[in-house]
C-alpha cells in the first residue's frame, strides 16, 4: 500500500514544504530558476589543465605557496594557483606495476578502471612534506612527498589502514596534529570504519556485539575547533557525514525493513580509547540521523562547512538527491545545519537496539556519569578523569551499546533552502563574502552530474541562483570544487581535467540595474566609471551600489540605466505577418510590450503573439501601425530593451512612371518589332506549303501502293537456299504467276531477285553504270539501289521494275560480292520468316 502511495505523498510534501510569502522570489515552490544561463561557448577567462591521465578528483589548495596539488590516476601534479595552464608545473608518475595490475585482475577486478593507482588522499603532513595515498591496484600505498622538490620517495608506507582499496568507494580524511583521521571501506572485504593512524593511540570503531557502522558510504569530514571558545575546556571534535543502512527502523515505514539514511557522527580529537573496555576503540563515538526534506528518499551527496574555526558560528551546507523507488522524479535539495543544533542532539536522549523486536527504540533508562560519548572537559579533569582511559567501565559499556541518538538533526528553520527539480548535484563548496554595506553572505558553488556549476547566494530562508555555467563541453560529473579567495578563482576537478575560472564576472553586467539585479555579493556598480566592478578591487568600496537582499534599489537617481536602444523601422503589407525580435537578458525577466507607450499587449490579443524571442504580429491591419517598445520586467524594475516603428501599407504601391524613350532607342525598338513580324509571317507560309506538299505526296503514294504486289518465294537449289522477291512485272521459276503478266524467264531481268549463298567467287566488277535519273516519272525520288541487311542472314535489293530506270547490274553485283565475301563463312538460316524482308 505504501509503495503505491509514496509518489502522491512525495508530491504532497513537495508542495506543502513551501516557504511563506517573500519579497525576494515567488513563494509557490522551493525551486529556484538561475537568473543567467552561460553556455560553454560564452565562457571567458576559463583555464584548462589536462595531463596524460584521467580522474583529477583529489585537490589540495596551498594558499601560502600559491600551489594547487592535484591527485589523479597514476600521477600527482603541482600547478600554479594563479594560472593552472603554467607550463612550469611539476609532475610525479606513480603507477601501479604491471605485476600488481595482473594480480588485481586475477582477483576479479576490472583492469580497465580499478587496477590502477588512484590517488585518493592528499594533505599537508608538516611544514616540509605532503602525504598522499593511492589505491595501487587494490594494494594501497602511502608516501610522504617533499613539498619543495616534489619527487616521489623511494620508501612507501602500507596504506590498508589509511586508504580504500576500491577507487569507487566513498572516502574522506584529515591530518590533524600529525594524526591521520580517515573514514572509508577498508581492506579487500570493504569494511566501513572510522580510523585514526600515524598516532600513538590508533583507534577504530566497534564491531561487536553490534556494528557501529552498517554498510556506510562516507562523504565528508571536518575538524571543528571547539576548544578555542569553550568556557568549559571542551575538546576539538571531528565530524563525519555519511550514508548507511538502517535495519529495523521504528518509523512509520515499518514495511521497509531496510533503507539507507544520512548520518552525522563525531569523535573527540583527544580520545585515547578505553583501558580495558573499548581498547583501541573510540570512546566518544556518537551518531545521529540527518534529515533534510523527505527522509526515505534522501541520498547525501556532498557537505561543506563554513566558519569551522569559530564553533559559535559554524554551520554546514549539505546537498541531497531525492529519488523515488521507481526513479520517476529526481530533484536535489540543499539544507543548512547549525553546529549548535547538532551539539544539542548529541546531548539528548539515546537509542537502544531491542533484540526482541529487532529494531531500534528510544532508551528510557538511566544514563551513567560522566555522560557517555562526551569529551574530557575541565569539570571531568577536576573529578580525576584526565583521559578517556580513566572513564568507568559502566560508561564505556553504555557507549558500546548506545552509539545512536534518538533525536534527528533537522535543518535550520525546519526546511530546505532550495529544492531544484531535474538537477542532480554532486558536490558543493562555499565561502563568506562581505559586502561594502557591512552584511556578510554565504556564497555557494554547486556542481552537477552533467558538468554545470550553479552559483547561489543564501538569503534568509531561501537561495537565489545568480547564474548557471556550463564548464564542460561534453557532459561529465563535477567531482571536486575548491575556492581560492586570494586568487579569486574556483577550481573544478573532474574525470577529464582541472578547470579554473573567476568567482565572479561583473563585467558582464552593462547597466546599473543589471548589476544590482544579479545580486552577486562580489559585484557592485561604480558610478564614477559607469561600470559593474568586483568589490574587492575597488579602493572606496562604500561608493559601490549594491542591493543583495532585494535586488532593486540604488539605481533610481543614477544616470547609468544604460543608453536607450535605437529605433528600428519595419514596413509590411496589410495581411502579412511580422516578427519584432527582443531577447530577454535574464531568465527571471518577463517580457512586456507597449504600443505607443501606453497600451499593454498580451498574448493572443488582436493578432499579437508574445514569445521568448519577441512579438509576432499576425494578419497585420492598418491599426497595427505605431511605435512598439519591448521591456524587461524583473523584481519590480522595468528596462527598455528594443524599440520599433511599424508601418502597415494598405496595398502594393503602383509602379513608378517610366521616362520617355529617346528617338534612337525608339527606332531600334521599331526595327526589332519589324523583324519579329516578318519572321512570323514567313514561318506561317512555310508551314502552309509543307502541309500542302505532304498532302499531295500522301495521295500519290496511296494510288501507287495499291497497284504493287510483292511475293516472297523460295527456290530449292543444291547446296543452299535462295530468297526470291517478285513484283507484278514477272514471276520466279518454279512457281505460278499470280500477277497480270504471264512473262518471265527466271533471270534478274524477269523481275525476280534470287540471293543464293555459296562459295563461288563473284564475277569481276563491271565498270560503274551511269547515274540514275534524279527523279522518276511519277515525281518521287528514285529508290536507292543498295543492299540492305534484314533480320537473319538474308539480303534483298529493293528496286522498281516498271516505268523506272533500274539500277545497273554491275553496281549491284559489285556490292553483293563484297558483302557475301565477308559473310561466306557465316551459317545462314534455312527457313526464313517474314521479318527478313
From Swiss-Prot:
Cytoplasmic face of the membrane: 695-837
One of the protein's GO biological processes: cell differentiation
Listed Pro residues bias regions: 762-774
GO molecular function: semaphorin receptor binding
Signal peptide span: 1-17
Glycan-linked positions: 55, 111, 126, 386, 540, 596
Protein name: Semaphorin-4G
Lineage: Eukaryota, Metazoa, Chordata, Craniata, Vertebrata
Gene behind this protein: Sema4g
Amino acid at each position: 500500500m505504501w509503495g503505491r502511495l509514496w509518489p502522491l505523498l512525495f508530491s504532497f510534501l513537495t508542495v506543502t514544504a513551501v516557504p511563506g510569502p517573500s519579497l525576494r522570489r515567488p513563494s509557490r515552490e522551493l525551486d529556484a530558476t538561475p537568473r543567467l544561463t552561460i553556455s560553454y561557448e560564452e565562457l571567458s577567462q576559463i583555464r584548462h589543465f589536462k595531463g596524460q591521465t584521467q580522474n583529477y578528483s583529489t585537490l589540495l589548495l596551498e594558499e601560502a605557496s600559491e600551489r594547487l596539488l592535484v591527485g589523479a590516476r597514476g600521477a600527482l601534479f603541482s600547478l600554479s594557483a594563479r594560472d593552472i595552464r603554467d607550463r612550469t608545473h611539476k609532475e610525479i608518475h606513480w603507477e601501479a606495476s604491471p605485476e600488481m595490475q595482473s594480480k588485481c585482475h586475477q582477483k576479479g577486478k576490472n583492469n580497465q578502471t580499478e587496477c590502477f593507482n588512484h590517488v585518493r588522499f592528499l594533505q599537508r603532513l608538516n611544514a616540509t612534506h605532503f602525504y598522499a595515498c593511492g589505491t595501487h591496484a587494490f594494494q594501497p600505498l602511502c608516501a610522504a612527498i617533499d613539498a619543495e622538490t616534489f619527487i616521489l620517495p623511494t620508501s612507501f608506507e602500507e596504506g590498508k589502514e589509511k586508504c580504500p582499496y576500491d577507487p569507487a568507494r566513498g572516502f574522506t580524511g584529515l591530518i590533524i596534529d600529525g594524526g591521520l583521521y580517515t573514514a572509508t571501506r577498508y581492506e579487500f572485504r570493504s569494511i566501513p570504519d572510522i580510523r585514526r593512524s600515524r598516532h600513538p593511540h590508533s583507534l577504530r570503531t566497534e564491531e561487536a556485539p553490534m556494528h557501529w557502522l552498517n554498510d556506510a558510504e562516507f562523504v565528508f569530514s571536518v575538524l571543528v575547533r571547539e576548544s578555542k571558545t569553550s568556557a568549559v575546556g571542551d575538546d576539538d571534535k571531528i565530524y563525519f557525514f555519511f550514508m548507511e543502512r538502517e535495519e529495523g527502523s521504528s518509523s512509520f515505514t515499518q514495511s521497509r525493513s531496510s533503507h539507507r539514511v544520512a548520518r552525522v557522527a563525531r569523535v573527540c580529537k583527544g580520545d585515547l580509547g578505553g583501558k580495558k573496555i573499548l581498547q583501541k576503540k573510540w570512546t566518544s563515538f556518537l551518531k545521529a540521523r540527518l534529515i533534510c526534506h523527505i527522509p526515505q528518499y534522501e541520498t547525501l551527496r556532498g557537505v561543506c562547512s563554513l566558519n569551522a574555526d569559530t564553533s559559535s558560528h559554524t554551520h554546514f551546507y549539505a546537498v541531497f538527491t531525492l529519488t523515488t523507488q521507481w526513479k520517476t522524479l529526481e530533484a536535489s535539495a540543499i539544507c543548512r545545519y547549525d553546529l549548535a543544533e547538532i551539539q544539542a542532539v548529541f546531548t539528548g536522549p539515546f537509542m537502544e537496539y531491542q533484540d526482541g523486536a529487532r529494531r531500534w527504540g528510544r532508551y528510557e533508562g538511566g544514563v551513567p556519569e560522566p555522560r557517555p560519548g562526551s569529551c574530557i572537559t575541565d569539570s571531568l579533569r577536576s573529578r580525576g578523569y584526565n583521559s578517556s582511559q580513566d572513564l568507568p567501565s559502566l560508561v564505556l559499556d553504555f557507549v558500546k551499546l548506545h552509539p545512536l541518538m534518538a533525536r534527528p538533526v533537522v535543518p535550520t528553520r525546519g526546511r530546505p533552502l532550495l529544492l531544484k527539480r531535474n538537477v542532480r548535484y554532486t558536490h558543493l563548496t562555499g565561502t563568506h563574502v562581505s559586502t561594502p554595506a557591512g552584511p556578510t553572505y554565504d556564497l555557494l558553488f554547486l556542481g552537477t552530474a552533467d558538468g554545470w556549476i550553479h552559483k547561489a547566494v543564501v538569503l534568509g530562508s531561501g537561495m537565489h541562483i545568480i547564474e548557471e555555467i556550463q564548464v564542460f563541453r561534453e557532459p561529465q560529473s563535477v567531482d571536486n570544487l575548491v575556492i581560492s579567495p586570494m586568487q579569486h578563482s574556483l577550481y573544478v576537478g573532474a574525470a577529464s581535467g582541472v578547470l579554473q575560472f573567476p568567482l565572479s564576472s561583473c563585467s558582464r553586467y552593462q547597466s546599473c540595474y543589471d548589476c544590482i539585479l544579479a545580486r552577486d555579493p562580489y559585484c557592485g556598480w561604480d558610478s564614477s566609471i559607469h561600470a559593474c566592478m568586483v568589490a574587492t578591487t575597488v579602493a572606496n568600496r562604500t561608493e559601490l551600489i549594491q542591493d543583495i537582499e532585494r535586488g532593486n534599489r540604488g539605481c533610481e537617481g543614477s544616470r547609468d540605466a544604460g543608453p536607450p536602444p535605437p529605433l528600428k523601422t519595419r514596413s509590411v503589407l496589410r495581411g502579412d505577418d511580422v516578427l519584432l525580435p527582443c531577447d530577454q537578458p535574464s531568465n527571471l525577466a518577463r517580457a512586456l510590450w507597449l504600443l505607443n507607450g501606453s497600451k499593454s499587449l498580451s498574448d493572443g490579443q488582436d493578432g499579437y503573439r508574445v514569445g521568448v524571442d519577441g512579438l509576432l504580429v499576425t494578419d497585420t491591419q492598418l491599426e497595427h501601425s505605431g511605435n512598439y517598445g519591448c521591456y524587461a520586467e524583473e523584481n519590480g524594475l522595468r528596462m527598455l530593451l528594443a524599440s520599433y516603428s511599424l508601418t502597415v501599407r494598405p496595398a502594393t504601391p503602383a509602379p513608378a512612371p517610366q521616362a520617355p524613350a529617346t528617338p534612337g532607342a525608339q527606332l531600334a525598338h521599331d526595327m526589332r518589332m519589324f523583324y519579329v513580324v516578318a519572321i512570323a509571317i514567313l514561318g506561317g507560309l512555310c508551314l502552309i506549303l509543307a502541309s500542302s506538299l505532304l498532302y499531295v505526296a500522301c495521295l500519290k503514294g496511296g494510288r501507287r501502293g495499291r497497284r504493287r504486289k510483292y511475293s516472297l518465294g523460295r527456290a530449292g537449289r543444291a547446296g543452299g537456299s535462295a530468297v526470291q522477291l517478285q513484283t507484278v512485272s514477272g514471276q520466279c521459276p518454279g512457281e505460278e504467276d499470280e500477277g497480270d503478266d504471264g512473262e518471265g524467264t527466271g533471270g534478274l531481268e524477269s523481275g525476280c531477285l534470287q540471293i543464293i549463298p555459296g562459295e563461288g567467287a563473284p564475277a569481276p566488277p563491271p565498270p560503274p553504270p551511269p547515274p540514275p535519273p534524279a527523279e522518276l516519272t511519277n515525281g518521287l525520288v528514285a529508290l536507292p539501289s543498295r543492299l540492305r541487311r534484314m533480320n537473319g542472314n538474308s539480303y534483298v535489293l529493293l528496286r522498281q521494275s516498271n516505268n523506272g530506270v533500274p539500277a545497273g547490274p554491275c553496281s549491284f553485283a559489285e556490292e553483293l560480292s563484297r558483302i557475301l565475301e565477308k559473310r561466306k563463312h557465316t551459317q545462314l538460316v534455312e527457313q526464313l520468316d517474314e521479318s527478313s524482308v
